[in-house]
Swiss-Prot record:
GO biological process: protein catabolic process; proteolysis
Residue span of region Disordered: 595-624
Binding, Zn(2+): 418, 422, 493
SMART domains given in the database record: AAA (SM00382)
Subunit details: The isolated soluble domain (residues 126-624) forms a stable hexamer in which the AAA+ domains (residues 126-400) are alternatively open or closed.
Cytoplasmic side: 1-7, 125-624
Cofactor binding, per record: Binds 1 zinc ion per subunit.
Periplasmic side: 29-103
Name used for this protein in its record: ATP-dependent zinc metalloprotease FtsH
Membrane topology: Multi-pass membrane protein
Length: 624
């Protein structure tokens, strides 16, 4: 059956070719002996032409010479009566034939060809609906995936978003028993917009709603609607909602709705581009739901600031549910969910791992456990150990360890003092985070890093931010103190310090010279954000100077601290050169001057030192 459209197309092309061939069948083929018009006139004057045949209105002249040979020539214009009489005066037999009537197929074959093609397209559109790949107009059909069976995911499989689940339980009750709400005259929200940074589980939560309510789940992406063909997006929106009505009660989920729901008038093409037509159709369809239609539209975005206001008004996306990165309790619950089916060793402490992964979202935690499982399988172990999880966390944050990279003794020494500087500043500064781990094992683009012991915190004080800047600058300060020289390793440290200092001045009102004034508006908070400048060039110069002074003050402060703790700095750096990695407990013992236990495993022998391309030292908080 799938080959039928191709057979029909071959038939159409064959008929078109026959029509063209028949159109030429009635015409006289060009005979042999074609001569130019000058030769014909010379033969005419010489009396060698016996007979000519002309057709009225035709420039072609056919004839026979005295020797019996046939010829054909072409004049610039059809011969007139005077010309023909002149030829007859020379004794030439002239026969004039009426204009040749084109056969019907020859005259109508272009129209016939067009008609056949239109008929074929109509056939495709009518009979190819069984499968989108067989239909000539399948690009107007929605690309949504319809899961007629309820997803197996339920609220039990979602963690770290308890408030969002509470908000959505009402939607679940409506989908389970819509008549109860209709009898009370209640109008359930037509649309629910899930807002949050990437990876927090917006799509997972939408599937859980469908699974909890046991209704079909229809999912599409915002980019599925917009195409280069005008009107395709609107047609796909109509088809999507027609599909939803056939499967009601159901959930329609549109992921990354900002691809189609961007504010109108802000893109290329003004009010006439394809994306805006698609958005208009989406608005119309959401308005077109009858009161008793049990269809709930859910959408997800991490850019709510660019959505069209008409999309967010009551009656469309009535509710916006913000889903943020989980706290320590939520992270532990997420880890336990993703740890199902994975053999964990007895030393695994998921609560401790949750404390050590602030800022991780659900996707990060799932990836962490998967990396740990891969590491355990690679090493031939039958269970995942805490060491595997720690290594996986480092891989997720900083990249895989470059065990084959052998540094020169000078580079290792610089890296050790650089990271020791970060660690001592984080340890001794009152409002800093403390040290979770410090290492000089290269990872990603870093030759080493200091991982701070951060906690979930929503409010950052001015003193804490100043200490953060000082910790970021401590690596460069240690280099200057020990080597009386500086390297390029603090590039990323400077970026972090400068960004914090600038935001303290322009956004958070933490500088006495500028006061509680917002000089910049930060947009797009879920994707890292960018600043919209709202001040003059003169103010910009003052801000730049204030940023420089603030950073210089913190640099001198942390440099003085490291000079005071020079002996401890040497001790930590030398221990790093010996052991490469220090945990929080080991670092504390080194700072206090206590001996360390021997490593559990013998260190693998390294290759002889060799010169390698310079890679910038730094850390999770510090260098690049």
């Amino acid at each position: 059956m799938p080959r039928a459209p191709f057979s029909l197309l071959a038939l159409v092309l064959g008929l078109a070719f026959l029509a063209w061939a028949f159109s030429l069948a009635g015409t006289v083929g060009a005979p042999s002996g074609t001569v130019n018009y000058t030769t014909f006139l010379e033969d005419l004057k010489a009396g060698r032409v016996k007979e000519v045949v002309v057709r009225a209105g035709d420039t072609r002249i056919q004839g026979v010479l005295e020797d019996g040979s046939a010829f054909t020539t072409y004049a610039a214009s059809p011969p007139d009566n005077a010309t023909l009489e002149g030829w007859m005066a020379r004794g030439v037999s002239v026969r004039v034939e009426p204009p040749q009537g084109q056969n019907a197929l020859g005259f109508l074959w272009p129209l016939l060809l067009v008609g056949l093609l239109i008929g074929a397209l109509y056939y495709f559109s009518r009979n190819g609906r069984a499968g989108p790949s067989d239909s000539a107009f399948s690009f107007t059909k929605s690309r949504a995936r319809v899961l007629t069976e309820a997803p197996k995911v339920t609220f039990k499989d979602v963690a770290g978003a308890e408030e969002a689940k509470e908000e959505l339980k009402e939607i679940v009750e409506f989908l389970k028993n819509p008549s109860r709400f209709h009898e009370m005259g209640a109008r359930i929200p037509k649309g629910v917009l899930l807002v949050g940074p990437p990876g927090v589980g917006k799509t997972h939560l939408a599937r859980a709603v469908a699974g909890e309510a046991r209704v079909p789940f229809i999912t599409a992406s915002g980019s599925d609607f917009v195409e280069m063909f005008v009107g395709v997006g609107a047609a796909r929106v109509r088809d999507l909602f027609e599909t939803a009505k056939r499967h009601a009660p159901c959930i329609v989920f549109i992921d990354e709705i900002d691809a189609v729901g961007r504010k109108r008038g802000s893109g290329v093409g003004g009010g006439n581009d394809e994306r805006e037509q698609t958005l208009n159709q989406l608005l119309v369809e959401m308005d077109g739901f009858e009161k008793d239609t049990a269809i709930v539209v859910m959408a997800a975005t991490n850019r709510p600031d660019i959505l069209d206001p008409a999309l967010l008004r009551p009656g469309r996306f009535d509710r916006q549910i913000a889903i943020d990165a989980p706290d320590v309790k939520g992270r532990e619950q997420i880890l336990r969910i993703h740890a199902r089916g994975k053999p964990l060793a007895e030393d695994v402490d998921l609560a401790l791992l949750a404390k050590r992964t602030p800022g991780f979202v659900g996707a990060d935690l799932e990836n962490l456990l998967n990396e740990a499982a891969l590491l355990a399988a690679r090493e031939g172990r039958r269970k995942i150990t805490m060491k595997d999880l720690e290594e996986a966390a480092d891989r997720v944050m900083m990249g895989p360890a470059k065990k084959s990279l052998v540094l020169s003794p000078r580079d290792r020494r610089i890296t050790a003092y650089h990271e020791a500087g970060h660690a001592l500043a984080a340890h001794f500064l009152e409002h800093a985070d403390g040290v979770h781990k410090v290492t000089i094992v290269p990872r990603g683009r870093a030759l080493g890093f200091m991982m701070p012991r951060r906690e979930d915190m929503l409010h950052w004080s001015r003193k804490r931010l100043l200490d953060q800047i000082a910790v970021a600058l401590a690596g460069r300060a240690a280099e200057e103190i020990v080597f009386d020289d500086v390297t390029t390793g603090a590039e990323n440290d400077f970026r972090q310090a400068t960004e914090l200092a600038r935001r303290m001045i322009t956004e958070w009102g933490m500088h006495p010279e500028f006061g509680p004034v917002a000089y910049a508006v930060r947009e797009d908070t879920y994707l890292g954000g960018y600043d919209v400048r709202q001040y003059s060039e003169e103010t910009a110069k003052r801000i730049d100077e204030a940023v420089r002074r603030l950073i210089e003050e913190q640099y001198q402060r942390v440099k003085a601290l490291l000079l005071e703790k020079r002996e401890v700095l040497e001790r930590v750096a030398e221990t790093l050169l010996e052991r490469e990695t220090l945990t929080a407990e080991e670092f504390q013992r080194v700072v206090e001057g206590l001996p360390l236990e021997a490593p559990e495993e013998a260190r693998e022998e390294r290759e002889p030192p060799r010169v390698v391309p310079k890679v910038k030292p730094g850390g999770a908080l510090g260098g690049a």
